[in-house]
A protein has these predicted regions:
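A conserved mid-to-late transmembrane alpha helix and its immediate loop/hinge
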Residues: 222-224, 229-233, 333-371, 394
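Transmembrane alpha-helices of multi-pass inner-membrane enzymes
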Residues: 386-395, 400-444
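Hydrophobic transmembrane alpha-helices and their immediate junctions
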Residues: 136, 213, 246-249, 253, ...
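A membrane-periplasm/extracellular boundary helix in multi-pass inner-membrane enzymes
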Residues: 3, 160-166, 227, 245-290, ...
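Long extracytoplasmic/lumenal interhelical loops at the membrane interface
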Residues: 284-300, 304, 308, 312-352, ...
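Transmembrane alpha-helical segments and their membrane-water interfaces
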Residues: 74-87, 99, 103-159, 196-202, ...
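Transmembrane signal-anchor hairpin modules in multi-pass inner-membrane enzymes, especially those
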Residues: 1-105, 139-145, 149, 204-208, ...
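Alpha-helical transmembrane segments of multi-pass inner-membrane proteins
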Residues: 73, 101-106, 145-174, 183-249, ...
Length: 444
């Protein structure tokens, strides 16, 4: 009796311990996922910048907003330590990303404001580390699902602010009435929702069973793009829609691949021809003038500033900081307080010189080729790696997204490029994982 009782109790205790361990693992996993979701939302810049940034000085940095980043950096370090071997392996496979970030930090030695460069270089390092963590921690499906969920939350929050709190969710002074959602400015909001639309479609492609959520959210995101009245965002969203269905045809109907490629080449050639020889008509078609709402005037003024420090730049993150510094003459000539270059390539040139532009250019071209190679070797992640990489280039032409500290676009690009350079196996809904370099099976 006693022996049996002891055996029963021991078995009961083992089962209880196993149950507790399982619960603890689920709890830790939930906490980790919650932290990752929080970090993605924080890096989006939504809501915090809207509330804390001075609308009369968009280039200024709120001390409170800066302090809020330190807890996030601590969380990134804790997450990175937990998966350190995988993170180091991912970094080793991505020397170009590491070199680009290190070069921005090295600009401390010739920076016009060394303390600012040091602080923002550390922020860039933490931003990039978070992108590498996402690449190391999650497979393609897990990454896309988490990014899509974060953007779905941002889309719903933006719609709520625009409808229920229009003094926050809509532009008040310039572009009055245009929706800006949880962002500070309508173009940032529109481009964010264009990226959200692409993520919703990619998440649906990876998990069609969740279409009841992703499809309506995609429609909401496209509606928010329209409400932002941003032409750049509309072009980006239209590209996402057309590109998604083009890749769908490419994957599903091999017999149509050659006609599809001819159609793409002819379309790009025609658009390029019209932009060169019918510039005014093309801009009028999308409701823009030649200056792209003053952007070309900004770029022309910045050419003179770039000529002063063409190879090394002014130091990472310093050009726009001092109102009496080198940016003074740009703002003086344009007669308004320009906050950024509104172009990622120009911004990078100002910060870290032509060397940084060349380094990132090599990184981007390699990433694009690896993304296109996925059309032959990859799985359902094809939609994201091809369209997301090209969309990043499109957005960088009108917004400062390249090598930007505390910026979600840079986090996502790093995560995507890092997985490409690491030759992450493709994601298939109904097939086992196989090595990247294994020849793909013919698609019927």
């Amino acid at each position: 009796m006693n022996s049996g009782s002891l055996t029963y109790n021991r078995g009961y205790d083992d089962a209880a311990i196993a149950a507790r361990n399982q619960f603890a693992m689920k709890l830790l996993s939930f906490i980790e996922n919650a932290i990752v979701l929080f970090l993605i939302l924080h890096f989006s810049g939504a809501l915090i910048a809207l509330i804390l940034t001075d609308p009369n000085d968009l280039s200024s940095e709120s001390p409170l907003a800066r302090l809020l980043w330190y807890p996030s950096y601590i969380l990134i370090l804790l997450l990175s330590l937990q998966y350190l071997p995988r993170l180091v392996r991912t970094a080793i496979f991505n020397p170009l990303i590491v070199i680009c970030v290190l070069w921005c930090g090295i600009s401390y030695f010739w920076s016009i404001e060394p303390s600012v460069t040091m602080r923002r270089s550390v922020a860039l390092l933490m931003t990039t580390t978070f992108g590498l963590f996402l690449a190391a921690r999650y497979d393609w499906n897990e990454l896309i699902q988490r990014l899509a969920l974060a953007y779905a939350i941002l889309a719903l929050l933006s719609a709520f602010l625009a409808l229920a709190m229009p003094e926050l969710g809509r532009m008040q002074q310039i572009h009055q009435g245009a929706w800006r959602g949880a962002w500070l400015e309508k173009n940032s909001f529109g481009l964010g929702m264009a990226k959200a639309l692409l993520l919703m479609m990619c998440a649906f492609a990876m998990k069609p069973a969740r279409g009841w959520f992703w499809v309506p959210m995609g429609m909401i995101c496209f509606g928010l793009v329209l409400m932002s009245t941003s032409k750049a965002a509309l072009l980006s969203a239209s590209f996402a829609l057309v590109g998604f269905f083009a890749i769908r045809v490419f994957r599903r109907f091999p017999v149509l691949r050659v006609p599809l490629m001819y159609t793409i080449v002819i379309s790009i050639s025609t658009i390029t021809f019209l932009l060169i020889f019918q510039t005014d008509a093309m801009f009028e078609l999308i409701g823009k003038e030649r200056t792209l709402t003053g952007r070309t005037d900004i770029w022309n003024s910045l050419v003179l500033a770039i000529k002063e420090h063409p190879w090394l730049g002014y130091g990472y993150g310093t050009f726009w900081g001092d109102p009496n510094g080198p940016s003074y003459w740009v703002r003086f000539s344009l007669e308004w307080g320009v906050p950024t270059a509104h172009n990622g390539w120009v911004e990078t040139w100002l910060s870290a010189g032509a060397i940084a532009v060349i380094l990132f250019g090599i990184l981007y071209v390699c990433s694009l080729f690896l993304a296109l190679d996925r059309l032959y070797r990859g799985g359902v992640e094809n939609y994201w790696v091809v369209l997301g990489t090209i969309q990043f280039l499109m957005i960088s032409m009108s917004e400062s997204t390249i090598l930007q500290q505390n910026d979600l676009s840079w986090v996502i690009f790093v995560a995507t490029a890092a997985k490409l350079f690491s030759f992450e196996p493709g994601y298939w809904r109904n097939k086992p994982i196989r090595p990247y370099f294994q020849p793909p099976e013919p698609r019927g």
